[in-house]
Each structure stands twice: as structure tokens, then as C-alpha cells.
Amino acid sequence: MRSRLAFPIFALVLMMAVLPAHAVTKVGKNIDITASNDPAERQQVEPTIAVDPRNQNIIVAGAQDYRLLSIGGHRWHGFYRSTDDGLTWTVSLVPGFPGDNSSQGLSSPLHAFQCTSDPVLTFDRNGNVYYTGITCSTPGFTLFVVKYTGDGATYAGTTLFPISTYHHADKPWIAVDTSGGQNDGAVYLSYDDVFAQGPQGATLVSSRDGGQTWSLPMAINPGGFDTGITVDQNGRVFVSSLSSGFPHASMFMSISIDGGHTFTTHRIFDVTELPRSLPGNSFRTFTIPQLASDSNGVYVVWDDYGLGNSNVMFSKSTDRGNTWTTPTRVNDVITGQHFFSSIAASGGVISIVWYDSRFGQLSNGTITGLNVFYAQSTNAGSSFSKNIRVTSASFNPNLAERADFGNTQPFMGDYIQVAASPGAAHPIWTDNRDACSNTVPIFGCTNQDLFTATIRF
């Protein structure tokens, strides 16, 4: 069934299509990216990951990295790179962090800031990495983009967006046109404009010269927030956003067919957002839809609380975003919580990952054993495989303390992510299996790490 009308999710959960496992052959070893490179054993959250389209053995990742706390600093964009398909990693911080007296650090426009947040990165077709985020200290939440060249090997500079023009930003997401068309190489950045003088909401900026200059901000859905973005194989730009009205919101899709110069926006679904903390738990949760696309269509996943627990929902469009399929549930059990879903598409395979509590939840809802699960589709989302456990050990998400301006609330970030290349998927997540190996005053548990694994099919 297809329609542009909004669907109530709770009425559709039973419509999930699940087939036997498709092409999954092996979930590889869980790799602790920061195990031996963070002597302070601090937290890393909100991970992001991308595979180099020129060389699938090269993978880059990022996260909010709290290692500077041990020397009086704060959270900062970590940058991690692998040249052996994710087996081993080099670890660094984006230049400009507090105490960075290198020439790159002193020349970075980030050098005046105390901390950064909301990391998301992507590759273009030429081996350039674009890494976005926001500052999180005076004078406000300022948007920035970092560029790495040489397949992510070389730092090439940082652009800071003037807050007087681009306002206070939140939750940026980034995508690059790799279509080979007239806008190939264009970089698109969506974010929440939270303090605009005019219409607030989902906003887009773009660059057509490799990040040297950027367009003025364009409001594409006033009142929208928590954007996701993808560029399809024909260069069309899709931006998802949610309306206000927590917990009952609507999802909107904004579409550009002219390289991001103009957008049309329409409402596609009703959504019940996750509560700010799941019942019985103290770490925070959000509903943040994520997008992917390939030659078969455009796909969206999100976490929905319409049945009184969190479920991973999926829909697709095969007509350039005009109509969307009835949402289906991806998690193949209804018990427990299933949240922080992420999606990627490559080589005819759709890959989805999420956090899942099916193996470790008390009767009051408290999660004691969290895992990462994976599902795939080889028929453009018409059905999904049996869910597959990715994590080799369960962990407690209510342990690690959030080292954030004196806030000691357990914190798992607001998202995890998956990247894909032909024949493989690469999830990345925040993991507490080694947390609380020791504690520090005020901030409690340490050693919350980034993990990844390679799933081959």
C-alpha cells in the first residue's frame, strides 16, 4: 500500500515482513577502537562511520571523545582511521582542542572553544572526508565542518560558520552527491536552527567547491527538527525531519531535484517519539530518523513508541519520494526495547543496526544487558532477514556517567551508526562492557569505548 497520507504506526506493527536470513555469512570480531589509545579511559559516544569508496579497506570514524577531561578539558571530536578493513585503528582528535599548540591547532577556528559535539562524517568519491559538528561553549552552538584529504590521511582545515548568519545549530547531518551528475561532489549539511530570528527548524547549507565556501542557510521545514539526509544516485537530495508536538509528532520529507536550490516538503507519517528516558532507565533517548538510498529507492528508519515500547520502523519510496510504503517493523521480537536505529545501503543490500534489550531487561523495564542487532534486506526492503546479534557481550547502559558540565546522568549518546560497502556492513556503537573498571570523582564510571565489527555477506 502506498500513500502520501500519514499512517498511525501502532496500527501497522503486525504488517512486518520477515523472511529467513538472506545473505549474511559472518559477523566479525568485536573491535574496541579506543582500547589502547585512551590512557585516561574516558568516554566516547555518538559514533559515526564511513567507508572510502575508492578503497574499501579504509574506514574512518568519529565520536564525542572525553579524554581531555583528565587534563582539565572537555569533550572533543575524535577522529579514528583504519586501513585494514577495521581491524586496527589510529586515534586522534580534530585539531584545535584545548591545549593543542600545534600549528594546525593554533590556526584552527575551533581553538577558542572549550568543546565540540554532535559528530557526523562522510566521504566523497575522491577520498575526501567531511566531518561536521557543533561547538558547545561560548558564544553558542556554532556549526563547523572539518575536511580531511588523501582518503582521510591528511587534515586539510576547518570551516566555522558565523553564528550571526547561521545561528545556534543542533544535530547536524551531512551527505555528499556521488551521482556523477552535474552536482557531483556537492556537500549538503542539514541541521536544526534552534534560535533563528525568523522561521526556526530544519535548515540546509551546501558547498560546491569542496568545502571552501558555503551557501547561506535555507529553511526547508520551519518547525522541523532532528534531520536526516541522503543524496540518491540521480543527485536528488532528501531531508527528513520531525515536527514539534512531543511525543506525538509527524515526519516530513523535504526533496530537492535541483541540487539543493529549492525544496518541496510533505508530511509522510505520524510518529510517536521515544520518551526522554525509557521506563526504568536513566540514560536519555531520542527519535532521530536516518536515511539511505540506492538505485532501488530511498529508505528511512526511525524508532517509534506507539506500542508502549521502542520499535525500529522502516519505509521506502520508489518514486522519488512522492509516496512511501506502509511502515514495517524491523526487529523480529516485540519484547524489550529496540532503539537508536541506523541504515546504510550498498551493493543491493540494505543494512540496519540498533540497540536491543531482548536478552537483558528486568520486569520494571530496567535494561541490564544491552546488545547491538543487525538485519538486512536483499529485495529493496520488501522483507528483512532474521535479526542477528552483533555484540559478543551484553552490557549495562545505566553505568557510565555523563561527564558533561557537572551532569552525572548515564549517557549513551543520541545515536549509533552503520556504514556499508559491497559485501560488507560496518556498525559502530558505544559499549559499556569494560566500563567501571575504575571510577573517578564526580563522573563515576570510566572506560566507555567505541566498538565496531565487520559483517560480511
Which residue ranges define each predicted feature?
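Bacterial N-terminal signal peptides that target proteins for export
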Residues: 1-9
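C-terminal PAP-associated
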Residues: 23-457
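Autoinhibitory N-terminal propeptides
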Residues: 18-22
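Bacterial N-terminal signal peptides
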Residues: 8-17
